[in-house]
C-alpha cells in the first residue's frame, strides 16, 4: 500500500465479482496501516463508480477480472482523487497487485499499525442506491470488533 502512496486515512476501493483471498489480504493491508476500505458492487455502472469514488475520495482502486477494470477506468478521468487502478488478475500490461507486495517498508508499516485506534474509520460501505445515489455507511474498527464479538 505504501508503495502506491496510500497512507492513514486514504480511501482504497475494492471491486470484485466473487469473494477471493486477494480481497481479504488487501482489505487487511488497508486496515493495518490505517487506510479506509471502500468496497463497491461489481454490477454498478461507471457513473455510479464515479459518484462513489468522488464522494469517498478514493485514491487507489483494486479490481477483479472481466470488465471491472474498464468500468472503473471509464470513471477515472472524472475522479480527481483516483491515482491508480490495480488488477487482481493479469490483464494485458495493466498493474497487477502482486507487483506491489514486498517487505521493504516493514518498519513503517509496523509503526503505522500501532497508531490505528478503535474509533478510526475502517471502511465505508455503500448502499445499493435504490432510491437515488448510493449512501455511504461509515464503520469504525470498533464497529467491526463489536460485530465479531457478538
Where is each model-derived feature located?
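Structural core segment of the AMP-binding/adenylate-forming
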Residues: 4, 32-99
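Conserved S/T- and glycine-rich ATP-binding loop of Class I adenylate-forming
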Residues: 12, 30, 61, 121, ...
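Helix N-cap/beta->alpha junction signal
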Residues: 16-19, 64-65, 120
Amino acid at each position: 500500500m505504501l508503495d502506491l502512496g496510500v497512507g492513514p486515512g486514504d480511501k482504497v476501493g475494492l471491486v470484485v465479482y466473487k469473494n477471493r483471498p486477494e480481497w481479504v489480504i488487501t482489505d487487511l493491508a488497508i486496515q493495518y496501516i490505517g487506510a479506509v476500505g471502500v468496497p463497491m458492487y461489481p454490477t454498478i455502472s461507471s457513473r455510479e463508480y464515479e459518484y462513489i469514488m468522488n464522494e469517498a475520495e478514493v485514491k487507489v482502486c483494486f479490481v477483479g477480472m472481466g470488465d471491472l477494470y474498464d468500468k472503473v477506468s471509464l470513471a477515472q478521468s472524472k475522479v480527481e482523487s483516483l491515482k491508480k487502478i490495480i488488477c487482481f488478475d493479469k490483464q494485458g500490461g495493466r498493474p497487477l497487485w502482486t507487483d506491489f507486495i514486498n517487505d521493504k517498508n516493514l518498519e513503517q508499516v509496523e509503526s503505522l499499525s500501532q497508531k490505528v485506534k478503535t474509533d478510526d474509520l475502517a471502511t465505508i460501505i455503500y448502499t445499493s442506491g435504490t432510491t437515488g445515489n448510493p449512501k455511504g455507511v461509515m464503520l469504525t474498527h470498533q464497529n467491526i470488533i463489536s460485530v465479531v464479538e457478538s
